[in-house]
Amino acid sequence: MSETAPAAAPDAPAPGAKAAAKKPKKAAGGAKARKPAGPSVTELITKAVSASKERKGLSLAALKKALAAGGYDVEKNNSRIKLGLKSLVSKGTLVQTKGTGASGSFRLNKKPGEVKEKAPRKRATAAKPKKPAAKKPAAAAKKPKKAAAVKKSPKKAKKPAAAATKKAAKSPKKAAKAGRPKKAAKSPAKAKAVKPKAAKPKATKPKAAKAKKTAAKKK
């Protein structure tokens, strides 16, 4: 019997082919991350503002025109331009001469350190008025103490009045003591007057005896 050769397997992807297929995806992702590095929005804004010769500063509309002339897509990156302006003003690289926020006019700050120095000074001046406000309640607290001292003084004045009333209360007692001996002196006199009255019944007895004698004589 003749041996038959095994049929060839259908086209199966080799393992190396799968790895090769995955690599292009990673390369595509790397291409997205590796965009051509150009100047940032803040750098473009600073260049455009420094190039302007206007004394009052470069307006937002003029800034957009300058960026568009340099090949920057202003319509798509409108929000980035506004954020870049705000960050540059907060850092002190740009000074806003007109308007508020991202709208208005901007110019380069010749002394960028001045903005950072002025901010802490304002905080220090705002903190100074708090010290006198703290002293006022202390002064107000001292005033009631003086009022309490004034209230204490009438108590001292009341003490002599109380002493005078005590002396006045004691004086009637002395007067009562002085009046008592007189009553005691009068009482013996009354006792003496009563004693002779007790002696009178004794004098009546002889009269009764005399009456008996006269009756005996008549008999």
UniProtKB/Swiss-Prot annotation:
Compartments (UniProt record): Nucleus; Chromosome
Compositional bias annotation for Low complexity: 1-19, 27-39
Keywords noted in UniProt: Acetylation, Chromosome, DNA-binding, Nucleus
Gene3D superfamilies for the chain: Winged helix-like DNA-binding domain superfamily/Winged helix DNA-binding domain
Main subcellular localisation: nucleus
Transit peptide as UniProt keyword: no
Name this polypeptide is given: Histone H1.01
